[in-house]
């Protein structure tokens, strides 16, 4: 069972790299959701999975993800992965749209999947949004050694 769940979770990222959003939707349970934990943003059901996937692809048309580590236990699969791309399109964010910057980024991410009966019920996505915003040049670099 855990190996089946690993295969399902991995295929989500393979489909994203190939921009096969219809196949991503097929992996999602009708009542499943993707949650961007840091901003408490929710994408519900297969249509939400497409919206989530398209959001990143619109912002980073050349974007690719590479899975670095996988841990599975029962219904849960944790994937650490690296995303790379150049923001040549607009990127939706919880605070509004970020216009294309033309900058390339490398982002470390971690997703926790809950998979039951062959479908994804929940994806909790964790990433360092401050690092992403600094790499895009829309947030100033943190001052090293600054004191409050």
Residue positions per predicted region:
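C-terminal and inter-domain tail/linker signature
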Residues: 1-148
């Amino acid at each position: 069972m855990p190996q089946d769940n690993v295969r399902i979770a991995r295929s989500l990222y393979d489909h994203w790299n190939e921009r096969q959003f219809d196949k991503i939707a097929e992996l999602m349970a009708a009542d499943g959701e993707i949650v961007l934990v840091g901003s408490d943003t929710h994408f519900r059901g297969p249509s939400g999975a497409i919206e989530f996937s398209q959001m990143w692809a619109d912002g980073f048309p050349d974007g690719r993800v590479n899975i670095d580590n996988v841990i599975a236990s029962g219904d849960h699969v944790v994937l650490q992965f690296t995303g790379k791309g150049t923001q040549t399109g607009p990127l939706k964010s919880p605070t509004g749209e970020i216009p294309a910057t033309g900058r390339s980024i490398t982002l470390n991410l971690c997703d926790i999947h809950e998979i039951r009966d062959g479908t994804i019920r929940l994806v909790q996505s964790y990433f360092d949004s401050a690092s992403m915003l600094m790499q895009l040049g829309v947030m100033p670099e943190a001052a090293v050694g600054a004191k409050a």
